[in-house]
């Protein structure tokens, strides 16, 4: 998120914007949330940070950031949203940006970021047989990347890396990542055009034999690159998984 926001800021300034305001939402609970706010302020090289209605947060950020930090009181009337309402609104926004069309993209002809299937195909029958005997599911594809291998298994459940043990680990010769075909459906992605603009997309399916991906997306122009995210949406566009490689 920090990288994407910084990129958007740079683009806006490059197109002549006098200033850029970034609304980071008001949810700041716990250390990771604090670090995220700080990283974002640093990532966009913020001249000023405005804290609304939270003196404790204001004091913390003032000690942590080189930016000018300002405090303003909360408005007398404000909307307070619970977890369920936030979830519903997020789902509605996903629908608004993703519904409207489908398309296929050949993953052989574009750059791929954030996906195991973008690695170099790696054939090792001993490794494949050893893994299949351990997890009880067919191995669809093995790819190699610097320092490890990624194993794509034909399973609806998410197979965990710790399930790959013993001889299979030794044959892999490094880090082992495991992706299940069932986890791929519903992964958020971005289709990048020739100008570097990222268009929202939702992965519907991947044919691993032809390396063709089907996406829900409004974008129908030329695709130069596909960036796979680490968020998986369910049928009602609710977030089911966050923070792990899913493709």
Say what each PLM segment does.
Residues 1-44, 123:
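Phosphate-binding/switch loop-helix module in NTP-utilizing enzymes
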Residues 50-55, 59-247:
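Preference for solvent-exposed, low-hydrophobicity sequence contexts
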Residues 30-33, 37-39, 47-61:
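Nuclease catalytic cores that cleave nucleic-acid phosphodiester bonds
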């Amino acid at each position: 998120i920090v990288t994407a926001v910084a990129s958007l800021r740079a683009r806006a300034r490059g197109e002549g914007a006098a200033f850029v305001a970034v609304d980071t939402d008001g949810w700041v609970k716990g250390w990771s949330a604090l670090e995220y706010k700080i990283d974002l302020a640093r990532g966009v090289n913020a001249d000023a940070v405005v804290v609304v209605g939270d003196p404790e947060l204001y004091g913390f950020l003032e000690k942590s950031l080189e930016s000018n930090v300002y405090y303003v009181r909360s408005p007398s009337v404000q909307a307070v949203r619970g977890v369920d309402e936030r979830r519903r609104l997020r789902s509605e926004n996903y629908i608004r940006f993703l519904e409207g069309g489908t398309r296929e993209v050949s993953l052989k002809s574009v750059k791929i970021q954030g996906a195991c299937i973008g690695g170099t195909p790696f054939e090792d029958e001993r490794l494949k047989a050893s893994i299949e005997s351990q997890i009880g599911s067919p191995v669809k594809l093995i790819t190699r990347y610097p320092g490890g291998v990624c194993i794509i298994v034909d399973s609806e459940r998410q197979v965990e890396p710790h399930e790959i043990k013993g001889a299979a680990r030794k044959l892999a010769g490094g880090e082992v990542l495991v992706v299940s075909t069932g986890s791929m459906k519903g992964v958020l992605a971005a289709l990048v055009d020739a100008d570097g603009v990222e268009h929202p997309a939702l992965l519907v399916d991947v044919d691993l034999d032809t390396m063709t991906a089907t996406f829900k997306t409004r974008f129908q122009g030329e695709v130069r690159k596909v960036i796979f995210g680490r968020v998986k949406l369910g049928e009602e566009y609710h977030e089911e998984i966050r923070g792990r490689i899913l493709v």
